[in-house]
């Protein structure tokens, strides 16, 4: 992969102190990856260029919201296997956040165990307010915690999470860039009512990256955000390409259309992902999963041809012919999924207290 040498690894300074005794997890011994993993980055996979640096990254990354969040002491073997298959399949971009429960910890632990810490392209987030307007102490502590959890002394992309306190935090990120603590600064959101606000930072060329909700069903980003990103040379990460698993529920039991074979599409995950990453503005999609078999399906979207503009229209028309597609957002998220990490535990406790 065409990336400059990275020097990210550092000792986990005060690691146990940072996590708290109750959340501390053992660092795993080194584990070998499949012998062919280095070849997975060959020219046969779909790569995208980061406009601000010219380096290339694979167009399919890995998200970690809910899927990597497990309670301390619970089995994590499935997460280890997800990362292994992701890496062996050619993936390099992993997205996480301090808000994702134990997600950062799992990424850091297994990346270290596999010996890939220095080679990952990590995108992370800041959700910070401070003790008073202009106070950046919370942001600094968040960055330091993320570095310790991920075992990095530099984060590739740091983004203002959901535009929280964005006008105070974005200048902080720009300072961190100058100091070499991060490489790129960005903003994120996934809720459609905030897309207008998100678009302003892209249109004003104030960021290097933008992370946005975009899928074959949710295409609002095409109106302002994606055109502005193309015009200003801003990298675009896509969250929720599967609509929180709703798309899979919609097509459950349905065969792929015959024309999918023209693109080498073997499953619905690749259908949805190839549609997303074929947009010229998209740099990388970050589907999340806790299922190793699903990860193998996802990373397969890096191979084979991508749809052109006419094929994208055909793929969309096919989805529009399926009952329930237009009202997909009205259905419950994560159908059939059972996530039991710190986040879900806290949400359940809050709901119980409100009764």
Predicted regions mapped to residue ranges:
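N-terminal twin-arginine translocation
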Residues: 9-17, 25-42
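Structured C-terminal cap/extension of enzyme domains
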Residues: 50, 224-355
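C-terminal segment of N-terminal export signals and the immediately downstream linker at the start
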Residues: 30-61, 74
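N-terminal secretory signal peptides
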Residues: 1-11
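Glycine/proline-rich, positively charged
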Residues: 129-220, 224, 230-237
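Acidic (Asp/Glu)-rich catalytic clusters
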Residues: 51-54, 108-118, 147-151, 177, ...
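Glycine-rich, proline-tolerant flexible connector loops at the mouths of alpha/beta enzymes
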Residues: 95-111
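Conserved, mostly hydrophobic/aromatic
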Residues: 50, 62, 94, 107, ...
């Amino acid at each position: 992969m065409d990336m400059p040498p990275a020097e990210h690894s550092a000792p986990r300074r005060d690691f146990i102190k940072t996590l708290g005794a109750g959340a501390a997890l053992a660092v795993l011994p080194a584990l070998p990856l499949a012998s062919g993993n280095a070849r997975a980055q060959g020219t046969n996979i779909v790569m995208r260029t980061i406009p601000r640096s010219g380096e290339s990254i694979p167009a399919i990354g890995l998200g970690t919201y809910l899927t990597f969040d497990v309670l301390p002491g619970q089995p994590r073997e499935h997460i280890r296997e997800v990362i292994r298959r992701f890496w062996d399949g050619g993936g390099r971009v992993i997205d996480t956040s301090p808000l994702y429960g134990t997600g950062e910890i799992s990424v850091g632990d297994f990346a270290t165990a596999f010996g890939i810490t220095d080679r990952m392209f990590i995108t992370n987030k800041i959700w910070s307010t401070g003790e008073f307007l202009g106070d950046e102490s919370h942001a600094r502590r968040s960055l330091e915690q993320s570095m310790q959890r991920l075992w990095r002394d530099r984060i590739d992309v740091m983004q203002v999470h959901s535009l929280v306190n964005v006008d105070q935090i974005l200048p902080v990120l720009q300072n961190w860039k100058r100091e070499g603590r991060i490489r790129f600064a960005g903003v994120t959101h996934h809720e459609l009512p905030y897309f207008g606000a998100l678009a302003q930072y892209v249109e004003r060329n104030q960021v290097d990256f933008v992370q946005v909700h975009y899928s074959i069903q949710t295409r609002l980003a095409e109106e302002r955000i994606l055109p502005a990103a193309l015009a200003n040379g801003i990298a675009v990460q896509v969250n929720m390409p599967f609509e929180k698993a709703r798309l899979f529920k919609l097509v459950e039991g349905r065969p792929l259309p015959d024309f999918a074979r023209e693109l080498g599409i073997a499953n619905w995950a690749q259908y949805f992902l190839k549609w997303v990453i074929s947009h010229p503005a998209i740099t990388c999609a970050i589907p999340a999963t806790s299922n190793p078999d699903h990860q193998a399906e996802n990373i397969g979207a890096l191979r084979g041809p991508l749809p052109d503009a006419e094929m994208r229209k055909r793929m969309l028309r096919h989805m529009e012919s399926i009952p329930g597609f237009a009202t997909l957002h009205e259905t419950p998220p994560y159908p059939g999924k059972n996530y039991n990490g710190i986040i879900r535990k806290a949400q359940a406790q809050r709901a119980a207290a409100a009764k």
